[in-house]
Swiss-Prot record:
It comes from Plasmodium falciparum (isolate K1 / Thailand). Its cofactor is FAD. It catalyses: 2 glutathione + NADP(+) = glutathione disulfide + NADPH + H(+). The gene is GR. Binds 1 FAD per subunit. This is Glutathione reductase. Keywords: Cytoplasm, Disulfide bond, FAD, Flavoprotein, NADP, Oxidoreductase, Redox-active center. Optimum pH is 6.8. InterPro entries: FAD/NAD-bd_sf (IPR036188), FAD/NAD-binding_dom (IPR023753), FAD/NAD-linked_Rdtase_dimer_sf (IPR016156), GSHR/TRXR-like (IPR046952), Pyr_nuc-diS_OxRdtase (IPR001100), Pyr_nucl-diS_OxRdtase_dimer (IPR004099), Pyr_OxRdtase_I_AS (IPR012999). Homodimer. There are 2 isoforms resulting from alternative translation initiation. The displayed sequence is likely to represent the shorter isoform. The active site is a redox-active disulfide bond. FAD binds at S12, G13, E32, T39, C40, K48, A111, D312, T354, H485. Catalyzes the reduction of glutathione disulfide (GSSG) to reduced glutathione (GSH). Constitutes the major mechanism to maintain a high GSH:GSSG ratio in the cytosol. GO terms for molecular function: flavin adenine dinucleotide binding; glutathione-disulfide reductase (NADPH) activity.
């Protein structure tokens, strides 16, 4: 039998493509070497959000006295881990049931290419023919093959790196007194904020002068201040040269400038992730790659005509003239930011977010089997950092907007205030958690090119504003909209130039 589509990888993008294609009456096979759901379900979005929720519950309980509650509480981490993992197992089973319901053939094992139409699966069990028992190898043939293998943690060549764990293994921790995280991206920041609120002494090590360097500086300043107030230790200019194991659950972190930090139960490395493509044998087919990422065009097609890729394992190459300089932020190519003219050379970009992979997978299936033409739109994708307090952001930072459009063409509206929720807290005003928000406007019409917020419920607030920015909302549009009171979000609709 020849499949219409073979999907390698059962994460968000692969599942979305497989199920959508099957609903278009395509004959589909999906290959997965581990648990269904990929990074998001198993070691990413879902368990992370549950831990974020636990940390948020901690904050409410700890401060409930300000609302008149006399609350004494204790925390049972092993119990939370057990309930979290049971929920994830339930999701794994739901994913399996959904594939069966949509008549997608599931194969368990590691896939590699034999040719552009054939793959070899090792260590498999065909779940649709269980009477056959376990199979050592299986060869599948498909007219189209989609690679959706996701990514995996990166471990740099640091002495003693074998003594560390990745963000994936963080979810296995059931007890710890002191944890150090090496890295300053969104995964590191989200985890360190959770760790502290679970009663664990916390250190985060950043190579540069601040965390989350690609985000708006004003927003990150607010976050860093809150983290320091909550006794999270931020170590900057931290060039780690060794992780030394002194004894069991006693690790020390050594920096190049001689600084030493000691007595860590766990050290977690969060310095990036790379595509999980090493077992695919792409070199047999001369599939184009860039820094190990599979290169695809805007239709998700690789350099081999019938092979596609979606999600965290690929990068989109845009080689035609780029007229919308606002897109440049997405390309992670800072050298382009100071260019005012159109850019014509090849640019590669990748947005590693679950909804992006799902969207790309579904639209690919629509193009392949319904002959539709819609492509994933990478412009103005909203992003949330589940820190404490959370951050919501859309579009350009103030710094990027000035570099692209010039300072004279950029107008900033911002406000910083205490959310009403914290108004009754019986503490000094400067200790109350602040909400900070900003609009980045460009041109005489004040087109909103960036929207940023940090504060309580920012993660829920930002979604609706993403629609407005996609529809080219201006500051005038915001001004003419009647706000909901009392809310934090209403501040976006009432901002004035003098507000600071």
């Amino acid at each position: 039998m020849v499949y219409d589509l073979i999907v390698i990888g059962g994460g968000s993008g692969g599942m979305a493509a497989a199920r959508r294609a099957a609903r278009h009456n395509a004959k589909v096979a999906l290959v997965e070497k581990s648990r269904l759901g990929g990074t998001c379900v198993n070691v990413g979005c879902v368990p992370k959000k549950i831990m974020f929720n636990a940390a948020s519950v901690h904050d409410i309980l700890e401060n409930s006295r300000h609302y008149g509650f006399d609350t004494k509480f204790s925390f049972n981490l092993p119990l939370l881990v057990e309930r979290r993992d049971k929920y994830i197992q339930r999701l794994n089973n739901i994913y399996r049931q959904n594939l069966s319901k949509d008549k997608v053939d599931l194969y368990e094992g590691t896939a590699s290419f034999l040719s552009e139409n054939r793959i070899l699966i090792k260590g498999t069990k065909d779940n649709n023919n269980k009477d056959n028992g376990p199979l050592n190898e299986e060869i599948l043939e498909g007219r189209n093959i989609l690679i959706a293998v996701g990514n995996k943690p990166v471990f740099p060549p640091v002495k003693g790196i074998e003594n560390t764990i990745s963000s994936d293994e963080f979810f296995n921790i059931k007890e710890s007194k002191k944890i150090g995280i090496v890295g300053s991206g969104y995964i590191a920041v989200e985890l360190i904020n959770v760790i502290k609120r679970l009663g664990i002494d916390s250190y985060i090590f950043a190579r540069g002068n601040r965390i989350l360097r690609k985000f708006d500086e004003s927003v990150i300043n607010v976050l860093e201040n809150d983290m320091k107030k909550n006794n999270i230790n931020i170590v900057t200019f931290a060039d780690v040269v060794e992780i030394k194991k002194v004894s069991d659950k006693n690790l020390s972190i050594h920096l190049s400038d001689g600084r030493i930090y000691e007595h860590f139960d766990h050290v977690i490395y969060c310095v990036g992730r790379s595509p999980d493509t090493e077992n695919l044998k792409l070199e047999k087919l001369n599939v184009e790659t860039n820094n190990n990422y599979i290169v695809v065009d805007e239709n998700q097609r690789t350099s081999v005509n019938n092979i596609y890729a979606v999600g965290d394992c690929c990068m989109v190459k845009k080689s035609k003239e780029i007229e919308d300089l606002n897109l440049l932020k997405l390309y992670n190519e800072e050298r382009y930011l100071n260019k005012k003219e159109n850019v014509t050379e090849d640019i590669f970009y990748n947005v590693q977010l679950t909804p992006v992979a799902i969207n790309a997978g579904r639209l690919l299936a629509d193009r392949l089997f319904l002959k539709k033409t819609r492509k994933t739109n990478y412009k103005l994708i909203p992003t949330v950092i589940f820190s404490h307090p959370p951050i919501g952001t859309i579009g350009l930072s103030e710094e990027a907007a000035i570099q692209i459009y010039g300072k004279e063409n950029v107008k900033i509206y911002e406000s910083k205030f205490t959310n009403l929720f914290f108004s009754v807290y019986d503490i000094e005003p400067e200790l109350k958690e602040k909400t900070y928000l900003k609009l980045v406007c460009v041109g005489k019409d004040e087109l909103i090119k960036g929207l940023h917020i940090i504060g309580l419920n920012a993660d829920e607030i930002v979604q609706g504003f993403a629609v407005a920015l996609k529809m080219n909302a201006t500051k005038k549009d915001f001004d003419e909209t009647i706000p909901i009171h009392p809310t934090a979000a209403e501040e976006f609709l009432t901002l004035q130039p003098w507000m600071k």
